[in-house]
């Protein structure tokens, strides 16, 4: 006999599968897959490396979706047979539980593959963390967040490079930027941008009082050099300085760090990780280009929101997530409502529950 809980799970999975099929058609996916494969067999496509790369990425994504659609359909067929036999066979009832468990993972994977369809979703990601007001307390919080994302990347098998690291005077960081290298790094992390709030008993307060701290996270994609963003030399203020900080093996200590200020926008980018001043300058310019591109996209998004009457002020009062360490333990995302009491796991990089819920939440909002 199948339990009530399992029946409820099956209903939820069937609904999710219907939602998937409402936005993607397997026949159309397979047709598109054939077209892309045909284009990649044409030798002339490789004359344009950018176009060839786009087709290759598209082919991989379509293959994954096609294979996972087949897998989910097959699992539902197996489930239907197992359910019919489960009333008379206890072992088959156990098999139903196993299929449902496998289906949960397969449907979730399929959902994410369909959602991660943005132009830059497959790209690497630059992730910056900035402390809010509050001195050492906020700077320590910013470093805790930085570690959380680095641990998350490690769990995913992604590579991490520290691009910039400015230590706080007592503890924590004044500013930090990392490059997370991995397939769909930007797609996964793009909704992590925003204000993150911490409530805890401060280790820096002798009176052991409760403190609230803020830090902002900003995520942008690593973009190709051929993106059409003009950066005029006369708009740049370029400074060099000695790299310093607790970046350990990641940070170069010679007089080669570069800080670039884009005068028209006030955007400041620093890089200290590369081995030479020239390399640091090139990396900083690459990040600046990505930030200017993001700024342009943000302007267009805001124009649309103003037309739709949806523009909201972005301020320290609009936190996307709270991390409560005292008087109880809870991490809660204020957009999706997802929460957990296991703050230690979250701070050790276990944040997929939040990321996956964000992706579904924003996909539904935009559909």
From Swiss-Prot:
Superkingdom of the source species: Bacteria
Molecular function GO terms recorded: translation release factor activity, codon specific
SUPFAM superfamilies xref list: Release factor
InterPro entries to which the protein is assigned, alphabetical: PCRF, Pep_chain_release_fac_I, Pep_chain_release_fac_I_sf, PrfB
Keywords from the named record: Cytoplasm, Methylation, Protein biosynthesis
Post-translational modification: Methylated by PrmC. Methylation increases the termination efficiency of RF2.
Pfam families, A to Z: PCRF, RF-1
Residue(s) carrying N5-methylglutamine: 249
Compartments reported by the entry: Cytoplasm
GO CC, alphabetical: cytoplasm
PROSITE patterns according to UniProt: RF_PROK_I
Broad class of where this protein is predominantly found: cytoplasm
Keyword NAD: no
Stated family: Belongs to the prokaryotic/mitochondrial release factor family.
Matching HAMAP family: Rel_fac_2
Its job: Peptide chain release factor 2 directs the termination of translation in response to the peptide chain termination codons UGA and UAA.
Protein name as annotated: Peptide chain release factor 2
């Amino acid at each position: 006999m199948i339990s009530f809980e399992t029946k409820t799970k099956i209903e939820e999975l069937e609904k999710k599968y219907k939602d998937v099929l409402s936005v993607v058609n397997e026949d159309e996916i397979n047709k598109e897959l054939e077209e892309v494969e045909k284009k990649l067999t044409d030798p002339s496509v490789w004359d344009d490396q950018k176009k060839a790369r786009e087709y290759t990425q598209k082919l991989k994504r379509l293959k994954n979706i096609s294979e996972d659609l087949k897998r989910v359909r097959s699992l539902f067929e197996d489930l239907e047979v197992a359910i019919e036999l489960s009333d008379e066979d206890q072992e088959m009832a156990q098999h139903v539980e196993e299929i449902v468990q496998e289906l949960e993972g397969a449907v979730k994977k399929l959902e994410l593959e369909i959602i991660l369809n943005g132009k830059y979703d497959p790209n690497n990601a630059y992730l910056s963390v900035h402390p809010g007001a509050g001195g050492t307390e906020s700077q320590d919080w910013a470093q805790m967040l930085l570690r959380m994302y680095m641990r998350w990347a490690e769990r995913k098998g992604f590579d991490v490079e520290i691009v910039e690291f400015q230590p706080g005077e007592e503890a924590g960081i004044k500013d930090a930027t990392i490059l997370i290298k991995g397939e769909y790094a930007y797609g996964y992390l793009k909704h992590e941008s925003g204000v993150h709030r911490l409530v805890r008993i401060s280790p820096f307060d002798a009176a052991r009082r409760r403190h609230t701290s803020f830090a902002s996270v900003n995520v942008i994609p690593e973009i190709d050099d051929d993106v059409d963003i003009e950066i005029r030399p006369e708009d740049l203020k370029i400074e060099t300085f000695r790299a310093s900080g607790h970046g350990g093996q990641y940070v170069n200590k010679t007089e080669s760090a570069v800080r670039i200020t884009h005068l028209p926008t006030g955007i400041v980018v620093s890089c200290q990780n590369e081995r030479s001043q020239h390399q640091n300058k090139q990396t900083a310019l690459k990040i600046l280009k990505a930030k200017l591109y993001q700024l342009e996209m943000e302007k267009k998004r805001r124009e649309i929101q103003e037309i739709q009457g949806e523009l909201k002020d972005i301020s320290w009062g609009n936190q996307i997530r709270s991390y409560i360490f005292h008087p109880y333990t809870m991490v809660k995302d204020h957009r999706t409502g997802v929460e957990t009491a296991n703050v230690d796991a979250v701070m050790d990089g276990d944040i997929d529950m939040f990321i996956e819920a964000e992706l579904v939440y924003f996909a539904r909002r935009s559909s």
